[in-house]
Structure formats: C-alpha cells, structure tokens
Amino acid sequence: MAKPATIKIRLNSTADTGFFYVTKKNPRTMTEKMVQRKYDPVAKKHVEFKEGKIK
C-alpha cells in the first residue's frame, strides 16, 4: 500500500479561545505552515488560524 499524499492538520485559533478546525494538506506542494482567516464562533469574529499538529 502506498503512503497517502495528504496529511491531516489542525488549524488553531490565534484568539486563544481553544477553537480549531481540522483540514488536510499536501506536504509536497505546501511546504510552509498553513495560515487561514476563518470564523471563530467562540470569539464571534473572523481571526487567523495557524497550523498545528494533531495530538
């Protein structure tokens, strides 16, 4: 069996609310850490989410 091309990552909120999203990325094409601006329902506004490892 071949190794999967995508890995699961965790996008942690920079608002320090503890909220996170789980998404996938291809580490061969996206070598840098992923940063996205998404909605944080705990903070009730859009904030940046930065990539972290799934424990």
Swiss-Prot record:
It comes from the Bacteria. The keyword Transmembrane helix does not apply. GO terms for biological process: translation. GO terms for molecular function: structural constituent of ribosome. GO terms for cellular component: cytosolic large ribosomal subunit. Keywords: Ribonucleoprotein, Ribosomal protein. Transmembrane segments: none annotated. Pfam families: Ribosomal_L33. Belongs to the bacterial ribosomal protein bL33 family. This is Large ribosomal subunit protein bL33. It comes from Hyphomonas neptunium (strain ATCC 15444).
